[in-house]
C-alpha cells in the first residue's frame, strides 16, 4: 500500500496539467528560480559540458532506538554518527555527467568506545546519462539514468575493541536509478519543482574476519551477503523568492536482508574449536521525510539546512538526522 501511494502521488505530481496558473504577467520565469536541491532526492539534470559541481554535506545521524519486526519503536542508547559526503561532479558533455562521492565519519556511541578518530567511509563513483529535457509548456520531464558503483574503502571488519571504527560495508555495491524532474506553476505564479526517483542496488559477498559492522565477534571467519535494496524518492521544492526555497522529501526503502555464514572460535573448552555460525537479519523497510529550507545567493551557489526523519519502519534503526550542505557550480 505504501509503495502504491508513493507511486500514485509522484505520478500526479509529474504529470499534473499546467492549469489554474496565474496570469502570464505574474508567472515566475525559470531563470528567476534558484535552487540548491532537496536533501535526499538527487537531481535528474546533467551539468553543462565543462562545468563542475561541488556539494559537501555534513550531518549527524542520531539513533535513539529501532523499529522491531512488528514495526514497534524500541528505545536504546543514543548514538551519534557524524559524517560528511561530497558530490564532486563534472559535465563531460551536456548529457553526460560523471564524478566521485567520498565519505568520512566518526561514531560517538552511548556505551563502549567511540571511534578512534575521523575515518574514511566507502567511496562512490557515479555516471549520469540524460534521457530527456524539460521544456516549458511541455509534458516531458527531465529524466536520466544514474549508475553508481560503491567501492569498499571504509573499514568494516577486524575492528578489535572498537566496533565504532566501522564506517564501511566491505562490499562492492552497484546501483541503477531512474531520476525525473518536472516544474509546475502554482496559482500564484510561483514555481514548484518536483522530483521522483526509483533505484535498485545489489552488493557482492563480503569476506568477514573478527569484530565487524555485521555484528560478528572476535574469532569469526566467514562471509556476509548484504541484501538488495529498492528505493523510492519524491521531493517538492517551492520557490518563495528567487533566494528562498522550501523543500520536502518523502522516501521509502526496502532491504531484502543480510545473511552471515561462517565459524566462531570457541575458547571456553580445553582446546579452542570452531563451531558453525549463521545469522539472518531478515528483510526491513523504512519510510522517512526530510523538510528543509534553502537559501541561494546566486543561481550557482546556495545552502540547504534540514532534518531527515525515519518516521516508520521494520527491522531498522530509528534515527533523526540534522543535515546542512552547500551547493556550488562552476
Model region roles, listed by residue range:
Residues 49-59, 165-274:
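Detector for outer-membrane/organellar transmembrane beta-barrel domains
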Residues 20-65, 135-142:
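Outer-membrane beta-barrel biogenesis signature
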Residues 65-74, 218-330:
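Outer membrane beta-barrel transmembrane domains
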Residues 25-31, 59-84, 113, 164-165:
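Surface-exposed strand-loop-strand hairpins of Gram-negative outer-membrane beta-barrel proteins
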Residues 56-60, 100-104, 145-151, 194-202, ...:
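Transmembrane beta-barrel strands of outer-membrane/channel proteins
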Residues 42-51, 95, 133-142, 185-192, ...:
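Short loop/turn motifs that connect adjacent beta-strands in outer-membrane beta-barrel proteins
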Amino acid at each position: 500500500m505504501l509503495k502504491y501511494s508513493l507511486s500514485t502521488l509522484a505520478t500526479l505530481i509529474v504529470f499534473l496539467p499546467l492549469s489554474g496558473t496565474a496570469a502570464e504577467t505574474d508567472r515566475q520565469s525559470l531563470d528567476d528560480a534558484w535552487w540548491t536541491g532537496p536533501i535526499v532526492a538527487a537531481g535528474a539534470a546533467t551539468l553543462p559540458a565543462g562545468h563542475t559541481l561541488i556539494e559537501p554535506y555534513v550531518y549527524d545521524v542520531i539513533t535513539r532506538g529501532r523499529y522491531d519486526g512488528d514495526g514497534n519503536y524500541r528505545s536504546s542508547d543514543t548514538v551519534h554518527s557524524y559524517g560528511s559526503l561530497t558530490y564532486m561532479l563534472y559535465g563531460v558533455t551536456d548529457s553526460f555527467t560523471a564524478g566521485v562521492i567520498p565519505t568520512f565519519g566518526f561514531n560517538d556511541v552511548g556505551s563502549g568506545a567511540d571511534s578512534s578518530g575521523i575515518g574514511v567511509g566507502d567511496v562512490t563513483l557515479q555516471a549520469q546519462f540524460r534521457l530527456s529535457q524539460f521544456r516549458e509548456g511541455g509534458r516531458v520531464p527531465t529524466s536520466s539514468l544514474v549508475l553508481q558503483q560503491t567501492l569498499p574503502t571504509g573499514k568494516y571488519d577486524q575492528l578489535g575493541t572498537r566496533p565504532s571504527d566501522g564506517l564501511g560495508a566491505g562490499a562492492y555495491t552497484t546501483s541503477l536509478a531512474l531520476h525525473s524532474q518536472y516544474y509546475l506553476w502554482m496559482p500564484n505564479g510561483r514555481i514548484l519543482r518536483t522530483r521522483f526517483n526509483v533505484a535498485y542496488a545489489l552488493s557482492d559477498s563480503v569476506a568477514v574476519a573478527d569484530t565487524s559492522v555485521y555484528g560478528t565477534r572476535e574469532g569469526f571467519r566467514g562471509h556476509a551477503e548484504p541484501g538488495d535494496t529498492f528505493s523510492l524518492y519524491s521531493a517538492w521544492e517551492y520557490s518563495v523568492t528567487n533566494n528562498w526555497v522550501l523543500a520536502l522529501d518523502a522516501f521509502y526503502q526496502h532491504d531484502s536482508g543480510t545473511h552471515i555464514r561462517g565459524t566462531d572460535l570457541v575458547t571456553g573448552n580445553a582446546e579452542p574449536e570452531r563451531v558453525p555460525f549463521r545469522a539472518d537479519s531478515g528483510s526491513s523497510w523504512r519510510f522517512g521525510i526530510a523538510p528543509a529550507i534553502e537559501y541561494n545567493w546566486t543561481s550557482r551557489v546556495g545552502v540547504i539546512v534540514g532534518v531527515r526523519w525515519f518516521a516508520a519502519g521494520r527491522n531498522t534503526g530509528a534515527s533523526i538526522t540534522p543535515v546542512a550542505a552547500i551547493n556550488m557550480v562552476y
